[in-house]
Amino acid sequence: KKKQIQRKKGENKVTEKNWNQLTHEEKRAERVKRWLEPPDIPFVSPQAKKDYVARLKRFADAYRMKKPDRVPVDVPFGDLPLKWKGYTLKDAMYNYDLIPQVWNEFMTKFEMDTFPAPAMSVLPGRVYDMVGCHLYKYPGNGLPDNALGFQFAEGEYMMGDEYDALIKDPSDFWVRTYLPRVFTSFGPYRNISPFTSIVELPGGYFANYAVPEMQKTLKTFMEAGEEFLKYSAVVGSCVEEAAKLGIPTPKTGGLDKAPFDTIGDTLRGTQGIMKDIYRHPDKLHIAMDRLADIQIEQAVNACNASGGLLVTFPLHKGADSFMSRKQFEVFYWPSLRKVINGLIDEGLIVFLFAEGSYMERLDMVNEFPKGTV
């Protein structure tokens, strides 16, 4: 459900009921207003608070294609702070205390308009080890200890004849088919019946959780969750420290993807989905449309929960070198366009991060309202 947008004290509230009656421009104005209101931060000085608000406004103006006071500076420096201080990525992945030590010093040395949180650069190594994640190779797990980054391990995690199962019930396919293929810890979920089998007299269903392998899995999940909270607390402390100094970490709705990439990156792999264009075009279209609705809802819910304004899309397989313009128009663009329009309708701003050249199809972005993409 869409959460209420709380205005400043003494003003009216925008409730879920009248939120649905607002235009996308009015919704965006409400989201921008909330985005610019600094939370209860113990700034180190009045100037730090002034800088915090000015920096956020600088980005909000740029996003909406208004002229900012100057060009905003957003430096995606990755794990550069670690290299700067002589540490490896693996050092920080397994010793979280290094993260604030290094990041806090880095941000006091180099002026910036935003603080790129270390969560996107430093994975919680022990969490990934615990759950047996096969989706990434990282230092000490598939890559040398001194590797400079981590690498997504693309694979065929959904077979070409499994489209019907995905379309019928994406959540069930994820839990009982996809996740067991990419996480060792999810293995026991292959053998349980769907949650929709819990209708009446449900007692027998819980026998699934008496199996030793399933109990081991649940224990692993709890331990991984506790470990992630340790990591999250450390990363959060970096964000809080930056905010005190007047450097915001803009709240976003996280990452979203073109449905073609969700299937091509996450499920079928590059070779698989390129074959599907010819072998299963109709089912591919149905699956992408099904996922588009889910992705819109997930991104909107994430922004409502965080107070975020921006949803970032890393665009992969729609690049000029991956497919022709005609293939882009038929397979990549329609479902991506649906997701973008769904987010615009909710007052969100879409950030399309083109990984590769999109010059041959850049003109298509012009169809959206000014200041929304």
Where are these regions (language model features)?
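Short, Lys/Arg-enriched N-terminal segments with co-localized hydrophobic residues
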Residues: 1-13
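Catalytic cores of TIM-barrel enzymes
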Residues: 13-373
